[in-house]
Each structure stands twice: as C-alpha cells, then as structure tokens.
Amino acid sequence: MTVVLAYSDRTSNTVFMAGDSCASDQIYQSLIKNPKVFHPVGRRDILIGCAGSFRMLNLMQHVSGIFPPENELATDDIDMSYLVTEFTPVIKAITEDFDEDDPWEMLIAVGSRIYRMQIDLSILEPTDNCDAIGIGGPVALGAFKVLNELAPYKSVEERMKHALTVACSSCKGCSPPFMFEHNEDIPREILNKIPKKRDKKGYEIIRHDIDVDESKADVSLEELLSNIDQKSSKHNGNKDSKSSKDKKHHNRFKQKKKP
C-alpha cells in the first residue's frame, strides 16, 4: 500500500523520486518515518524506491554491498545486463526467506535511466521517462503525465507533489507527507528549475484546488464566462428579432386571404 513516482529530467540528466509515508493493511493505516525512496549504502549515484514489504525496504536501505562501491563499479557500467546477471542474484539471496505475504516491487534509478524490478525478479525499463509503483502508482503516473503536458512551467517537485496528491485522494493505502530524493548531489535551484517555456495554447484543465498562476493562462475564467454571456445574449436577441419578423409576415398573409 504505497505510491512511489520516478521521473528522469532530461534537462538536468537527473532522476527524481518521491514516495508517500503510509503503512497500512486491509483495516488500519499509520504514518511512518521510514523513507520509501533512498540511496543504497555507499552509492549517491543510485536511487531506489520500494513498495510492498517493509522488510525488503529495510534490507535495501541498510544492507551494505548490494551495489559495489563506485571505485569498483562505475555508474555507466550499471545497465540492464548488469542488473540481470549480477544484481538479480543478490536480490534472490536476500529474499529467500520471503513468503507470499511479503510482496514487493522496486524502482531503480541509475544515471538518467529508470528500471522497475518485480517480485518475480524480472526487470523492465519504461520507454517513457517516468514510472510509478504501489497501489497509487497508476493514478500518480497518469496525473503526472497530464501535468507534464498542461503545466510544464511548474517545477519538477511541484508536479510530482500534485500527482502524488491526486493518487492519495483516490487510493486507499497511501498518504502524505511525501519524501523527495534525486540521484545526484545537485543544487536546489536545479531541482526547482523550469524545464521549458510554456508554449501550450488553449484553456488549461487543472484542478481548482491546485495553485495556478492565472497570468500565464490564455484567458481568465471571468473573461471566458463574459464571452459566453455575450454570445448567449446576442443569440437570444437574434431569435427574438426573427420571431417578430415571422409573426408580421404571417399576419400579412392572413389579411390577403380574406375574401
């Protein structure tokens, strides 16, 4: 019962990850301090997000040697081949005593690439530059993609926060506060960098409870409603005028028919 969202920002060549703070079962839920997104021991260039079993989360966060140190294994050498042939046996070993009540999945960010590892030890790499796991994953992923299209002027953190908020409002088992991480030590101004200028036209469809800078919109709500009222009044006026003309024509026709 979790939501973890990952996004690869191509402008800064960095992966950002965010997760919720909820622990729950079918009846109860509580907030926890354990981060669901973190760096494995000794590797600031790698980022991991876990959903499902908290035992898996504990092991991935605190057991050393899951990934060799950077002086033994460079970031560029960690690719799909390495994860399948070298990383997968390590995960298989530490999950040998897991049972069916310990389901899990994880996101692994290396460099600017995102991988998803599933409970059967299969590894997937999405074609999109984002992915999400957990009960709220599909909702968060959909909301985030919409925000990328409609609100690219918002910072990465703002877009991720909005997407996670939508997931938590729609799915039982995930809840704020949200924890954010990135797989490099980059300045805060890069984290909040506007990725590109807004070039969209038309009306934006964004939830009214999300802060939106109306100065960047193509038309304000008041202007839109005013235009609708004006068109409606003009249309009704034309109908009344046409009705009056038809009535006069009908009366003249009746007068001519009289013997």
Spans of features found by a protein language model:
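Long, low-complexity, intrinsically disordered segments
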Residues: 219-259
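Short, hydrophobic/aliphatic alpha-helical segments
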Residues: 114-128
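Intrinsically disordered, low-complexity, compositionally biased regions/tails
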Residues: 56, 69, 177, 206, ...
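Intrinsically disordered, low-complexity segments enriched in small/polar residues
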Residues: 40, 50, 171, 200, ...
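Intrinsically disordered, low-complexity segments enriched in small residues
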Residues: 1-16, 27-32, 42, 153-231
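Conserved short S/T/G-enriched processing/targeting/catalytic segments and their helical context
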Residues: 1-100, 124-157, 174-183
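Conserved phosphate-donor
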Residues: 95-118, 169-185
